[in-house]
Amino acid sequence: MLALKISVYTVVFFFVGVFLFGFLASDPTRTPARKDLESPQD
């Protein structure tokens, strides 16, 4: 039972971490201000 709980928590935290990482990684592309700071085209 303990192994099942550990495995479930591991999978849940893994998917949550991947989701948060993907959201933070794609966030600068959605906000024009930070995108302009990263790659100024003017």
UniProtKB/Swiss-Prot annotation:
What's any one GO cellular component for it? photosystem II reaction center
Keyword annotations for this protein, in alphabetical order, are: Membrane, Photosynthesis, Photosystem II, Reaction center, Thylakoid, Transmembrane, Transmembrane helix
The main location class comes to membrane
Record-level GO BP terms:
photosynthesis
Where in or outside the cell?
A: Cellular thylakoid membrane
Origin superkingdom? Bacteria
Span-the-membrane segments of this chain are: 6-26
The answer to whether the entry has keyword Acetylation is no
Give the quaternary structure.
PSII is composed of 1 copy each of membrane proteins PsbA, PsbB, PsbC, PsbD, PsbE, PsbF, PsbH, PsbI, PsbJ, PsbK, PsbL, PsbM, PsbT, PsbX, PsbY, Psb30/Ycf12, peripheral proteins PsbO, CyanoQ (PsbQ), PsbU, PsbV and a large number of cofactors. It forms dimeric complexes.
Q: Which PANTHER family match?
A: PHOTOSYSTEM II REACTION CENTER PROTEIN I (PTHR35772:SF1)
| Family per record | Belongs to the PsbI family.
Provide the protein name: Photosystem II reaction center protein I
Q: Which source organism?
A: Prochlorococcus marinus (strain SARG / CCMP1375 / SS120)
